[in-house]
């Protein structure tokens, strides 16, 4: 398994992924394996599970290299968040049918996040998870009366640790956390988690999207 962490607020979206690849058959590990992609100013995604399965799900939107992981394509993708999500979920539905009829078995635990045109959102996609995540797709948004919403593809203990650290920071600061503070929380999760979960390391890659208001316009970068 791997760990992908994603968090959204009113103005920022942050995603991170560890960089350890585990050969399930031999239990060998190696590093330098990228698991997150920023497709454009509105769309990011991260993958866990069997990388071949995720490369099929996101085919055409990134390269998959067995040594280096998921890499940005040379193409510039001028595609909206909603259109991208529709394409990926249509593929997922076909894979789900194959999985349920035993035509093919998948191991997917992926996250898409970004701006849907009006607000930031996170979508979790799971199929045949080896750690017991329920199959299906879940879309989450930040509640109006709460400062953030997070989703994690990984062990339940990692999720609990993230929430404990995030809420501790909010009680301490009494204000919105910065991108740097979110990155620090994610780093602390893997610093601790890599001590008991040998499928992850504490070398994180990060991608971010910021919502900026300028001269009456709303920009994303």
Language model: regions and residue ranges:
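N-terminal nucleophile
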Residues: 1-221
């Amino acid at each position: 398994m791997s760990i992908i962490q994603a968090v959204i607020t009113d103005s920022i979206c942050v995603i991170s992924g560890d960089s350890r690849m585990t050969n399930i058959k031999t239990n060998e590990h190696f590093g330098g394996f990228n698991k997150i992609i920023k497709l454009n100013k509105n769309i990011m995604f991260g993958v866990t599970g069997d990388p071949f399965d995720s490369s099929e799900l996101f085919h055409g939107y990134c390269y998959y290299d067995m040594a280096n992981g998921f890499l940005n394509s040379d193409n510039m993708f001028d595609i909206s968040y909603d259109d991208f999500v529709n394409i990926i979920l249509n593929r997922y539905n076909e894979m789900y049918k194959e999985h349920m009829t035993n035509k093919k078995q998948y191991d997917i635990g992926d996250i898409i996040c970004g701006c849907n045109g009006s607000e930031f959102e996170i979508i979790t996609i799971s199929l045949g998870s080896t750690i017991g995540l329920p199959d299906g797709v879940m879309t989450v948004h930040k509640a109006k009366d709460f400062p953030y919403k997070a989703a994690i593809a990984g062990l339940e203990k990692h999720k609990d640790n993230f929430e404990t650290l995030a809420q501790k920071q909010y009680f301490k600061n009494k204000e919105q956390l910065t991108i740097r503070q979110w990155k620090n929380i994610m780093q602390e999760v893997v610093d601790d988690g890599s001590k008991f979960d040998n499928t992850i390391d504490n070398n994180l890659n990060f991608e971010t999207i910021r919502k900026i208001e300028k001269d009456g316009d709303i920009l994303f970068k």
